[in-house]
Design a protein with these regions (language model features):
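Conserved donor nucleotide-binding strand/loop of the catalytic core
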Residues: 42-67, 71
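Catalytic-site signature of metal-activated, phosphate-bearing donor transferases
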Residues: 63-69, 75, 80, 86-215, ...
Length: 373
């Protein structure tokens, strides 16, 4: 058997069927490990031909994931969540890649939320006892991959598979309350894990605990600042702390400048820089920043290792450029940028009204500038 899919689930009747249908023609077996569902999750798994197993929940996502890996018989494993989908792909061509003995793992292109760009994430790896997850929450396969490679070698490849995440809809309150104690335990076990600190800060914010959120952002910023070789995702604490400062009307200019020095290819940081300048009334400086965001997006010269809101690559900087030129009373250029924004988001009433206003104001200025007879 070549290829297995491994899932852990609990009360996923809303998402599971679509997930299993999306991978059924790609893999040879589907392992579903249920950690205590009380809805139709188990029935759906069986209806779709999955091999269903139960696992007592131990407040440890890695333990559940590793149990699923223990049950898989394929030479390769895809790990996927119930609220994710694999987009149609050339299954035969992809499976041919798995026959290459020089590879130990492959990344997929993951869209983490609706309307986001994709980023590479390691989801496919050899079925080997050395390769196991670690981490009570936000479980991580990289330590297992690195252990395998240190003993046996192997390359990391990129696949054509595209996954999209369909979750994060509706009220997340109960999920946040569930994850909060797990994150606290995980950070006691691994206090240097950047992603866990970011998640903790975001949960505190979502639960209205702004002060605790700020403390978490400060803690993780200190961790990142000590890194000799920061990764792309290490920009997230800067973004989180900058947004916290902006929400509380605090000056974030020094922090944004530091962040851009450390992560010059991160478009979200540049966009936030432009917003800060614009809000401070520095419209000419902001124009240069938003033009940089647009040109970088068009040329593809930015950090693709993290996901962005797709609007940040076009309509957001266009609308901010339009606003800057409006504030500078250059209604002609402002109207042109609102028109470009409308071409992307044709249903946006605000852009339509402001474009019309720019046209009227431009005519008014021209009339005032005409010489008297």
């Amino acid at each position: 058997m070549l290829f297995s899919a491994a899932l852990i689930v609990r009360n996923e009747e809303k998402f599971l069927e679509s997930c299993l249908l999306s991978i059924r023609g790609l893999v040879d077996e589907i392992i579903v490990v249920d950690t205590g569902s009380t809805d139709r999750t188990q029935a759906i798994a069986l209806e779709q031909g999955a091999k269903l197993h139960e696992f007592k929940w131990k407040h440890d996502f890695a333990a559940a994931r590793n149990h699923a890996l223990d049950l898989a018989r394929g030479k390769w494993i895809l790990y996927i969540d119930a609220d994710e989908r694999v987009h149609p792909a050339d299954a035969a061509r992809f499976r041919e890649k798995l026959l290459d003995p020089s590879f130990v793992a492959h990344s997929v292109q993951l869209h983490p939320r609706l309307g986001s760009t994709a980023y590479p994430e390691l989801r496919i790896f050899r079925n080997d006892p050395l390769i196991r997850f670690c981490g009570r929450i936000h479980e991580n396969i990289w330590p297992g991959i690195n252990l395998y490679r240190s003993q046996r070698g192997g390359r990391i490849g990129t696949s054509e598979l595209v996954l999209s995440h369909e979750g994060y809809e509706g009220d997340q309150y109960h999920k946040h309350r569930r994850n909060l104690p797990l994150l606290r335990m995980a950070l006691k076990e691994d206090p240097g894990r950047v992603f866990s600190w970011c998640h903790l800060a975001n949960i505190y914010t979502a639960l209205g605990k702004e002060r605790q959120g700020m403390k978490a952002w400060k803690r993780v910023l200190n961790i990142v600042r000590k890194k000799k070789n920061p990764r792309s995702e290490d920009s997230l604490p800067f973004i989180g702390m900058i947004r916290w400062k902006l929400r509380h009307n605090q000056n974030a200019l020094a922090l944004i400048n530091e962040a851009i020095r450390r992560f010059p290819a991160n478009l979200q940081l540049h966009w936030l820089h432009g917003k800060i300048l614009m809000d401070a009334g520095h419209f000419k400086e902001a124009i240069g920043v938003f033009e940089h965001v647009l040109s970088s997006a068009k040329s593809g010269q930015y950090d693709h290792a993290i996901a962005y809101d797709k609007r940040l690559l076009d309509v957001f900087p266009l609308s901010e450029l339009a606003t800057c030129y409006f504030k500078l009373q250059d209604y002609g250029k402002s109207g042109l940028y609102f028109e470009q924004a409308l071409q992307i988001d044709s249903s946006n009433l605000e852009y339509r009204v402001k474009r019309a206003l720019c046209s009227k104001l431009e005519i008014s200025v021209e009339i005032q500038q005409e010489p008297s007879p």
